[in-house]
Regions:
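Iron-associated oxidoreductase/ferritin-like identity signal
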Residues: 1-142
Length: 142
């Protein structure tokens, strides 16, 4: 049984490292978007993109702390070859799905601290998700 838990722990660390890379990529995209904003609502777009970039960096940092706590080594850099989705809603849905999977894995392994971190990230993602029209939208995670 212990070997199975170690295998699951290794899988979880690998999955969390993938999530760290995704969060860093998202932060990078938001920073680029903030720097290239040229619309009439430039200030609002820059504030929103900066806020989302900061949230993604907080998520990556929290996940890196959990990877260290689990005995792993956090992902070191942003993967430049990672495909980037133009559809923010689809990307947001994918993030929620991935974090729900991590939450289940953490629950199965009895990792309460990681569960708390993931719940906090999911809650923050709910607030930061936006539709194409620019209105805030809550995405259900049931």
């Amino acid at each position: 049984m212990r070997a199975s838990n170690e295998f699951c722990g290794t899988q979880l660390i690998e999955a969390l490292n993938e999530d760290i890379e995704r969060e860093l990529r998202i932060a990078d995209e938001h920073i680029a978007r903030a720097l290239s904003a040229h619309s009439l609502r430039k200030d609002a777009a820059q504030r929103h993109s900066s806020s989302c970039a900061a949230a993604a960096m907080r998520h990556a940092t929290a996940l890196a702390a959990e990877v260290l706590h689990l005995g792993g080594v956090p992902a070191p850099c942003i993967p430049r070859d990672m495909p980037c989705s133009r559809d923010r809603l689809a990307r947001g849905s994918d993030l929620f799905r991935r974090y729900r999977q991590r939450l289940k894995m953490a629950n199965d392994l009895g990792l309460l601290r990681l569960e708390d971190v993931l719940r906090e990230i999911i809650q923050e993602l709910r607030v930061c998700s936006r539709t194409r029209s620019g209105m805030f939208r809550l995405i259900r995670i049931n």
